[in-house]
Amino acid sequence: MPSNAHRPDVPAARPDSPASGSPGSVSPAGPASAVGPTIDLNADLGEGLGPWSMGDDDAMLEIVTTANIACGGHAGDPSTMRRALASARARDVAVTAHVAYPDLTGFGRRFVDMSPQDLTDTLIAQIGALSALAAAEGTAVRGVKPHGALYNAIAHHEGHARAVVDALSTPAHTSLPLVAAPGAIVAGLAEDAGIPVVLEAFADRGYRPDGTLVPRREPDAVITDEHAIVDRVLMLAVDGQVRAADGTLVPVRAQSICLHGDTPGAVHLAGVVRSALEHEGITLRSAV
């Protein structure tokens, strides 16, 4: 279990916290089931490239339960990947392959109009590269989470959603769960193909009333207020809902919550979030 080294003081408990096993609790998709509400905290890590680095991976790995490691699409060279894998293994943190469009220049935040077959092939290569390095470190990739523009596109782009499912349907990857947004086309296609799906929500992203994320180019796309983020995470973990940018309460069934590790104060904020969840009696455990 990650240590408490980076966790600040715990916020006050919510008076409306449910008892263990209440209807508001969220059950993860992992292999074992804990008593009471359980949630996974994941972060995107290993997003450096050569001499350039992003975020404090080691500090985040003391807090999160799953690390999504970039594997060459938007970031991540072999040495960066292997260092991140070694750090995750040392802290007993589960690893997913953070696959992306082949877009190093745009950090994977631009849609790439490529054929589904080409996309499938590049995703197989990315997962394979991280898996090979994981094996060299005596560990294994336990899931796949798309990044950036790919994550957003496969919520509605059926061709690219099927390409992701095809990549996970190859013999080498059939046991890997897919991390996806609730209601995304890719989630339904993956379930139809027999691929386990872990549903995810975001601690610091704005939501629309329909449950989709507010695009980054629009106001209210990113939440920066610490108290608002803690309230968001507790509402997700306990009540299974979020408050949209217009104030609407939106049902969001999530087994994992993403904490971005590349924003200012990310480590402090992640520690506050983890402490708040533990103070509410919520078990932190990987969902992959």
Q: How would you label these PLM feature ranges?
A:
Residues 58-62, 83-96, 135-138:
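Acidic (Asp/Glu)-rich catalytic clusters
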Residues 183-241:
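Active-site rim beta-loop-alpha module in soluble metabolic enzymes
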Residues 53, 57, 66-74, 105-120, ...:
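Glycine-rich tight-turn/loop motif centered on a GG-T
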